Amino acid sequence: MAKKSMKNRELKRQLTVAKFAKKRAELKATIVNLNASPEERFAAVVALQKQPRDASASRLRNRCRLTGRPHGVYRKFGLGRNMLRQAAMRGDVPGLVKASW
């Protein structure tokens, strides 16, 4: 299991990303807009750089919902490989069956 502090840090990052998502999208649109003046585009770049580092969605890490494990997480289920296997063996995941050939 991941430490509580790591889980909380990731949760805090998710909240920060959600808080700044709209403003970041506006600034990025201004930066790519070729019709905007160079001063406006530069101001948008500066404003984007002044935002918190954790406001970027690329800082998020997929973690297992049950254990907080950072690696081996299946996006479709939101579970780590170990927890997914246990859930499948219990029959908690509909449609998922153990491979046999």
Curated annotation (Swiss-Prot):
Please give the GO cellular component terms listed in this UniProt entry: cytoplasm; small ribosomal subunit
Q: How does it assemble?
A: Part of the 30S ribosomal subunit. Contacts proteins S3 and S10.
The protein's name in its UniProt record: Small ribosomal subunit protein uS14
Which InterPro entries does the record match to this protein?
Ribosomal_uS14, Ribosomal_uS14_bac/plastid
What organism does the record attribute this protein to? Pseudomonas putida (strain ATCC 47054 / DSM 6125 / CFBP 8728 / NCIMB 11950 / KT2440)
Q: Which GO terms describe its molecular function?
A: rRNA binding; structural constituent of ribosome
Per the record, the similarity remark reads: Belongs to the universal ribosomal protein uS14 family.
Q: Name one Pfam family in it.
A: Ribosomal_S14
Annotated SUPFAM superfamilies: Glucocorticoid receptor-like (DNA-binding domain)
Task: State what this protein does.
Answer: Binds 16S rRNA, required for the assembly of 30S particles and may also be responsible for determining the conformation of the 16S rRNA at the A site.
Record GO biological process: translation
* Protease as UniProt keyword: no
Q: Which keywords does this Swiss-Prot/TrEMBL entry list? A: Ribonucleoprotein, Ribosomal protein, RNA-binding, rRNA-binding
Which domain of life does the protein's organism represent? Bacteria
